[in-house]
């Protein structure tokens, strides 16, 4: 069983989603199925089929969450330090072409969310950053072409 690296915050968030799906969503969906079933003929009952589809989706996500939580390798970022970039680091970069600054935290695949400034450890940018230090320059082959970034800060938060 392959371990899935994740932060303690990511583990907690997945646990909360699992709890909600099991204790709130599952009973609500079962109620919808029972209500739709009471309307008679199931072969032409759109409400019933929609509720069954929702149940299938929810149960699939529950199984996925249980699997990820069971395989979690929780990494406590508060205990990490140093100036070398690794899993959990929050890195400030400056694009060498545009001088635009960006801040990214390197997290597990299940936690990655670009809108929240979190990139997967398996992403091209994270792979280029791992092992580097403040002051280094990294080149990343992005969909829009090669980009160069200077690492201006490495933090652990």
From Swiss-Prot:
UniProt GO MF annotations: DNA binding; RNA polymerase binding
Sequence segments annotated as region (Disordered): 1-60
Keyword Coiled coil: yes
Any one of the GO BP annotations: regulation of DNA-templated transcription elongation
Pfam families named among the record's database cross-references: GreA_GreB, GreA_GreB_N
Matches recorded under SUPFAM superfamilies: FKBP-like, GreA transcript cleavage protein, N-terminal domain
InterPro entries: GreA/GreB_C_sf, TF_GreA/GreB_CS, Tscrpt_elong_fac_GreA, Tscrpt_elong_fac_GreA/B, Tscrpt_elong_fac_GreA/B_C, Tscrpt_elong_fac_GreA/B_fam, Tscrpt_elong_fac_GreA/B_N, Tscrpt_elong_fac_GreA/B_N_sf
PROSITE patterns recorded: GREAB_1
Keyword vocabulary terms for this entry: Coiled coil, DNA-binding, Transcription, Transcription regulation
Coiled coil, from the record: 46-73
Start-end of Basic and acidic residues biased regions: 16-60
Role of this protein: Necessary for efficient RNA polymerase transcription elongation past template-encoded arresting sites. The arresting sites in DNA have the property of trapping a certain fraction of elongating RNA polymerases that pass through, resulting in locked ternary complexes. Cleavage of the nascent transcript by cleavage factors such as GreA or GreB allows the resumption of elongation from the new 3'terminus. GreA releases sequences of 2 to 3 nucleotides.
Family of the protein in this entry: Belongs to the GreA/GreB family.
NCBIfam families listed in its UniProt record: greA, PRK00226.1-2, PRK00226.1-4, PRK00226.1-5
Protein name in UniProt: Transcription elongation factor GreA
UniProt gene name: greA
